[in-house]
Swiss-Prot record:
Encoding gene per record: rsmH
Keywords assigned by UniProt, alphabetized: Cytoplasm, Methyltransferase, rRNA processing, S-adenosyl-L-methionine, Transferase
Domain of life where this protein originates: Bacteria
Lineage: Bacteria, Pseudomonadati, Campylobacterota, Epsilonproteobacteria, Campylobacterales
Protein name per its UniProtKB record: Ribosomal RNA small subunit methyltransferase H
Gene3D superfamilies given in the database record: Putative methyltransferase TM0872, insert domain, Vaccinia Virus protein VP39
Major site of localization recorded for this protein: cytoplasm
Biological source species: Campylobacter jejuni (strain RM1221)
Amino acid sequence: MEIPHIPVLLNEVQEIFKNLKTGYFLDCTLGFGGHSEALLKNHPDLKFIACDQDQQALEFSKKRLKDFRNRITFMQSNFSEVLEKISHKEELRGILADIGVSSFQLDNNERGFSVNSDFLDMRMNQNSKISAYEIINTYTKEQLTSIFKDYGELHDAHFIAEKICLERSKNPIKSAKELYQIIGKGKQNHRKISKATLAFQAIRIEVNQELKVLKDFLGHLENLKPKNCILAIISFHSLEDRIVKQFFKKWSKNCICNEKIMRCECGNNHSLGQIITKKAISASKEELLKNSRSSCAKMRAFYFNNLDNK
Protein backbone atom coordinates (compact mmCIF):
# COMPACT_ATOMS: atom_id res chain seq x y z
CA MET A 1 0.00 0.00 0.00
CA GLU A 2 1.45 3.34 -1.06
CA ILE A 3 1.35 5.86 1.80
CA PRO A 4 0.37 9.33 0.50
CA HIS A 5 1.50 11.29 3.56
CA ILE A 6 4.49 11.33 5.92
CA PRO A 7 3.48 11.98 9.56
CA VAL A 8 5.41 14.88 11.09
CA LEU A 9 7.27 14.71 14.41
CA LEU A 10 6.62 10.96 14.59
CA ASN A 11 9.49 10.19 16.98
CA GLU A 12 8.60 13.16 19.16
CA VAL A 13 4.95 12.08 19.34
CA GLN A 14 5.99 8.58 20.41
CA GLU A 15 8.27 10.06 23.07
CA ILE A 16 5.46 12.19 24.53
CA PHE A 17 3.14 9.18 24.86
CA LYS A 18 5.75 6.51 25.68
CA ASN A 19 4.51 5.86 29.23
CA LEU A 20 0.89 5.14 28.32
CA LYS A 21 -0.18 1.61 29.27
CA THR A 22 -3.93 1.05 29.28
CA GLY A 23 -7.09 3.04 28.66
CA TYR A 24 -8.16 4.90 25.53
CA PHE A 25 -6.21 7.03 23.09
CA LEU A 26 -8.01 9.60 20.94
CA ASP A 27 -6.47 10.52 17.59
CA CYS A 28 -8.62 13.53 16.71
CA THR A 29 -7.09 14.01 13.26
CA LEU A 30 -6.30 10.52 12.02
CA GLY A 31 -5.39 11.56 8.48
CA PHE A 32 -3.58 8.67 6.81
CA GLY A 33 -2.87 6.88 10.06
CA GLY A 34 0.88 7.34 10.48
CA HIS A 35 0.86 8.48 14.09
CA SER A 36 -1.80 5.99 15.16
CA GLU A 37 -0.07 3.06 13.45
CA ALA A 38 3.17 3.70 15.35
CA LEU A 39 1.36 4.13 18.68
CA LEU A 40 -0.79 1.04 18.14
CA LYS A 41 2.35 -1.04 17.55
CA ASN A 42 4.12 0.29 20.64
CA HIS A 43 1.15 0.21 23.04
CA PRO A 44 -0.57 -3.18 22.68
CA ASP A 45 -2.94 -2.63 25.61
CA LEU A 46 -4.25 0.77 24.50
CA LYS A 47 -7.59 1.08 22.72
CA PHE A 48 -7.97 3.76 20.06
CA ILE A 49 -10.66 6.14 18.88
CA ALA A 50 -9.65 7.52 15.48
CA CYS A 51 -11.44 10.47 13.91
CA ASP A 52 -11.14 12.54 10.78
CA GLN A 53 -13.49 14.78 8.83
CA ASP A 54 -11.94 13.78 5.49
CA GLN A 55 -13.75 10.71 4.15
CA GLN A 56 -10.92 9.80 1.76
CA ALA A 57 -8.36 9.80 4.55
CA LEU A 58 -10.65 7.81 6.83
CA GLU A 59 -11.25 5.09 4.24
CA PHE A 60 -7.52 4.80 3.54
CA SER A 61 -6.67 4.49 7.24
CA LYS A 62 -9.30 1.80 7.80
CA LYS A 63 -7.41 -0.36 5.30
CA ARG A 64 -3.99 0.62 6.62
CA LEU A 65 -4.90 -0.20 10.23
CA LYS A 66 -6.96 -3.32 9.52
CA ASP A 67 -4.62 -5.49 11.61
CA PHE A 68 -5.62 -3.44 14.67
CA ARG A 69 -9.37 -3.42 13.99
CA ASN A 70 -10.18 -5.09 17.31
CA ARG A 71 -8.60 -2.17 19.19
CA ILE A 72 -9.71 0.79 17.14
CA THR A 73 -13.01 2.60 16.56
CA PHE A 74 -13.30 4.92 13.54
CA MET A 75 -15.44 8.02 13.38
CA GLN A 76 -15.97 10.74 10.78
CA SER A 77 -16.02 14.05 12.62
CA ASN A 78 -14.40 17.44 12.83
CA PHE A 79 -12.06 17.35 15.81
CA SER A 80 -13.86 20.28 17.47
CA GLU A 81 -16.96 18.08 17.85
CA VAL A 82 -15.41 14.73 18.60
CA LEU A 83 -15.33 15.08 22.40
CA GLU A 84 -19.10 15.47 22.43
CA LYS A 85 -19.59 12.28 20.42
CA ILE A 86 -17.26 9.69 21.91
CA SER A 87 -17.73 7.26 24.77
CA HIS A 88 -15.08 6.33 27.36
CA LYS A 89 -14.23 9.96 28.15
CA GLU A 90 -13.24 9.00 31.70
CA GLU A 91 -10.77 6.45 30.35
CA LEU A 92 -8.92 8.80 27.99
CA ARG A 93 -5.19 8.67 28.67
CA GLY A 94 -3.86 10.28 25.51
CA ILE A 95 -5.16 12.77 22.95
CA LEU A 96 -3.41 13.80 19.74
CA ALA A 97 -4.45 16.53 17.31
CA ASP A 98 -2.32 17.15 14.21
CA ILE A 99 -4.13 20.11 12.71
CA GLY A 100 -2.20 20.55 9.48
CA VAL A 101 -3.15 19.84 5.88
CA SER A 102 -1.87 16.48 4.62
CA SER A 103 0.46 16.10 1.66
CA PHE A 104 -2.32 14.17 -0.09
CA GLN A 105 -4.69 17.12 0.24
CA LEU A 106 -2.04 19.59 -0.91
CA ASP A 107 -1.00 17.48 -3.89
CA ASN A 108 -4.47 16.39 -4.99
CA ASN A 109 -5.42 18.70 -7.86
CA GLU A 110 -9.17 18.35 -7.30
CA ARG A 111 -8.97 19.45 -3.66
CA GLY A 112 -7.83 22.92 -4.74
CA PHE A 113 -5.34 23.59 -1.94
CA SER A 114 -2.25 24.11 -4.09
CA VAL A 115 -1.42 27.29 -6.02
CA ASN A 116 -1.06 25.03 -9.08
CA SER A 117 -4.52 23.51 -8.83
CA ASP A 118 -7.13 23.76 -11.59
CA PHE A 119 -9.80 23.95 -8.89
CA LEU A 120 -10.59 26.41 -6.09
CA ASP A 121 -11.93 24.40 -3.16
CA MET A 122 -9.75 23.96 -0.02
CA ARG A 123 -12.42 22.14 2.00
CA MET A 124 -11.04 19.56 4.43
CA ASN A 125 -14.56 18.19 4.77
CA GLN A 126 -15.89 17.88 1.24
CA ASN A 127 -19.45 17.95 2.54
CA SER A 128 -19.00 21.52 3.81
CA LYS A 129 -21.07 24.11 1.96
CA ILE A 130 -18.55 26.94 1.68
CA SER A 131 -15.49 26.48 -0.51
CA ALA A 132 -12.70 28.85 -1.53
CA TYR A 133 -14.62 29.52 -4.74
CA GLU A 134 -17.55 31.06 -2.83
CA ILE A 135 -15.26 33.12 -0.63
CA ILE A 136 -13.20 34.53 -3.48
CA ASN A 137 -16.19 35.27 -5.70
CA THR A 138 -18.83 36.43 -3.21
CA TYR A 139 -17.15 37.98 -0.16
CA THR A 140 -17.01 41.77 -0.06
CA LYS A 141 -13.73 43.63 -0.44
CA GLU A 142 -13.84 44.43 3.28
CA GLN A 143 -14.36 40.77 4.21
CA LEU A 144 -11.47 39.64 1.99
CA THR A 145 -9.23 42.35 3.42
CA SER A 146 -10.02 41.17 6.94
CA ILE A 147 -9.20 37.54 6.05
CA PHE A 148 -5.84 38.41 4.47
CA LYS A 149 -4.93 40.77 7.31
CA ASP A 150 -6.06 38.64 10.26
CA TYR A 151 -5.17 35.14 9.02
CA GLY A 152 -2.37 35.84 6.55
CA GLU A 153 -0.89 38.81 8.41
CA LEU A 154 -0.43 40.48 5.01
CA HIS A 155 0.46 44.17 5.06
CA ASP A 156 -1.12 44.82 1.66
CA ALA A 157 -4.33 42.89 2.39
CA HIS A 158 -6.49 45.74 1.08
CA PHE A 159 -4.59 45.85 -2.22
CA ILE A 160 -4.89 42.06 -2.72
CA ALA A 161 -8.63 42.17 -2.00
CA GLU A 162 -9.02 45.05 -4.43
CA LYS A 163 -7.24 43.12 -7.20
CA ILE A 164 -9.44 40.07 -6.63
CA CYS A 165 -12.64 42.12 -6.74
CA LEU A 166 -11.51 43.82 -9.95
CA GLU A 167 -10.73 40.54 -11.72
CA ARG A 168 -13.90 38.75 -10.61
CA SER A 169 -16.00 41.66 -11.91
CA LYS A 170 -14.88 40.60 -15.39
CA ASN A 171 -15.21 36.82 -14.93
CA PRO A 172 -15.54 34.48 -11.95
CA ILE A 173 -12.22 33.24 -10.58
CA LYS A 174 -12.42 29.48 -11.04
CA SER A 175 -9.01 28.02 -10.25
CA ALA A 176 -6.21 28.32 -7.73
CA LYS A 177 -3.82 28.90 -10.64
CA GLU A 178 -5.81 31.93 -11.71
CA LEU A 179 -5.96 33.28 -8.16
CA TYR A 180 -2.21 32.79 -7.82
CA GLN A 181 -1.58 34.93 -10.90
CA ILE A 182 -3.84 37.67 -9.53
CA ILE A 183 -2.16 37.78 -6.11
CA GLY A 184 1.36 37.69 -7.49
CA LYS A 185 4.60 35.99 -6.53
CA GLY A 186 6.20 38.67 -4.34
CA LYS A 187 7.20 38.27 -0.69
CA GLN A 188 6.31 40.26 2.38
CA ASN A 189 9.08 42.31 3.94
CA HIS A 190 11.28 40.27 6.30
CA ARG A 191 9.35 37.04 5.55
CA LYS A 192 10.55 34.02 3.62
CA ILE A 193 7.07 32.81 2.68
CA SER A 194 5.57 34.18 -0.53
CA LYS A 195 2.61 36.53 -0.52
CA ALA A 196 0.51 34.00 -2.45
CA THR A 197 1.26 31.22 0.05
CA LEU A 198 0.18 33.43 2.95
CA ALA A 199 -2.97 34.49 1.10
CA PHE A 200 -3.89 30.89 0.25
CA GLN A 201 -3.28 29.90 3.86
CA ALA A 202 -5.61 32.68 5.00
CA ILE A 203 -8.35 31.56 2.60
CA ARG A 204 -8.00 27.95 3.78
CA ILE A 205 -8.32 29.04 7.41
CA GLU A 206 -11.54 30.89 6.54
CA VAL A 207 -12.96 27.99 4.49
CA ASN A 208 -12.43 25.49 7.31
CA GLN A 209 -12.86 27.93 10.21
CA GLU A 210 -9.61 26.52 11.56
CA LEU A 211 -8.99 28.95 14.42
CA LYS A 212 -12.58 28.70 15.66
CA VAL A 213 -12.45 24.91 15.45
CA LEU A 214 -9.23 24.85 17.50
CA LYS A 215 -10.66 27.18 20.15
CA ASP A 216 -13.85 25.11 20.34
CA PHE A 217 -11.83 21.91 20.78
CA LEU A 218 -9.71 23.41 23.56
CA GLY A 219 -12.82 24.83 25.19
CA HIS A 220 -14.46 21.39 25.23
CA LEU A 221 -11.32 19.93 26.82
CA GLU A 222 -11.35 22.66 29.45
CA ASN A 223 -14.92 21.73 30.36
CA LEU A 224 -14.23 18.00 30.25
CA LYS A 225 -11.15 18.21 32.51
CA PRO A 226 -9.84 14.74 31.64
CA LYS A 227 -7.85 13.02 34.37
CA ASN A 228 -4.43 11.42 33.99
CA CYS A 229 -4.43 12.34 30.32
CA ILE A 230 -1.71 13.67 28.01
CA LEU A 231 -2.70 16.07 25.24
CA ALA A 232 -0.38 16.82 22.30
CA ILE A 233 -1.21 19.32 19.57
CA ILE A 234 0.77 19.78 16.35
CA SER A 235 0.11 23.09 14.60
CA PHE A 236 1.53 24.64 11.43
CA HIS A 237 0.58 28.29 11.75
CA SER A 238 1.80 30.91 14.23
CA LEU A 239 -1.78 31.93 15.05
CA GLU A 240 -2.70 28.34 15.93
CA ASP A 241 0.43 27.86 18.03
CA ARG A 242 -0.33 31.09 19.87
CA ILE A 243 -3.83 29.87 20.75
CA VAL A 244 -2.51 26.53 22.04
CA LYS A 245 0.19 28.27 24.08
CA GLN A 246 -2.35 30.63 25.66
CA PHE A 247 -4.73 27.82 26.62
CA PHE A 248 -1.94 25.72 28.13
CA LYS A 249 -0.68 28.68 30.14
CA LYS A 250 -4.20 29.37 31.41
CA TRP A 251 -4.76 25.72 32.33
CA SER A 252 -1.51 25.51 34.31
CA LYS A 253 -2.37 28.44 36.59
CA ASN A 254 -3.61 27.84 40.11
CA CYS A 255 -4.59 31.46 40.69
CA ILE A 256 -7.03 33.06 38.26
CA CYS A 257 -7.43 36.36 40.12
CA ASN A 258 -6.98 39.68 38.36
CA GLU A 259 -3.27 40.49 38.29
CA LYS A 260 -3.97 43.85 39.94
CA ILE A 261 -5.29 42.14 43.08
CA MET A 262 -2.53 41.93 45.69
CA ARG A 263 -3.95 38.92 47.52
CA CYS A 264 -5.40 35.73 46.04
CA GLU A 265 -9.18 35.45 46.46
CA CYS A 266 -9.95 32.54 44.13
CA GLY A 267 -8.73 29.67 46.31
CA ASN A 268 -5.51 29.17 44.33
CA ASN A 269 -6.62 25.72 43.18
CA HIS A 270 -7.67 26.10 39.55
CA SER A 271 -4.79 24.36 37.77
CA LEU A 272 -5.86 21.56 35.42
CA GLY A 273 -2.35 20.14 35.17
CA GLN A 274 1.15 20.88 33.92
CA ILE A 275 2.71 21.99 30.66
CA ILE A 276 5.01 19.18 29.46
CA THR A 277 6.81 21.11 26.73
CA LYS A 278 8.50 24.28 27.99
CA LYS A 279 8.98 25.33 24.37
CA ALA A 280 7.27 24.13 21.23
CA ILE A 281 8.95 21.06 19.72
CA SER A 282 10.07 21.45 16.10
CA ALA A 283 11.30 19.00 13.48
CA SER A 284 14.88 17.77 13.69
CA LYS A 285 17.43 18.43 10.96
CA GLU A 286 17.12 14.80 9.91
CA GLU A 287 13.36 15.07 9.51
CA LEU A 288 13.62 18.33 7.59
CA LEU A 289 15.88 16.64 5.05
CA LYS A 290 13.34 13.85 4.55
CA ASN A 291 10.19 15.98 4.71
CA SER A 292 10.50 19.72 4.04
CA ARG A 293 6.82 20.21 4.88
CA SER A 294 7.63 19.54 8.53
CA SER A 295 9.47 22.86 8.76
CA CYS A 296 6.42 24.74 10.08
CA ALA A 297 5.30 22.02 12.51
CA LYS A 298 5.27 22.86 16.21
CA MET A 299 4.11 20.49 18.95
CA ARG A 300 3.05 21.42 22.46
CA ALA A 301 1.94 18.96 25.14
CA PHE A 302 -0.04 19.24 28.38
CA TYR A 303 -0.71 16.77 31.18
CA PHE A 304 -4.15 16.83 32.80
CA ASN A 305 -3.66 15.56 36.34
CA ASN A 306 -6.09 13.58 38.47
CA LEU A 307 -6.94 16.24 41.03
CA ASP A 308 -10.50 17.37 41.63
CA ASN A 309 -9.88 21.06 42.12
CA LYS A 310 -13.43 22.10 42.70
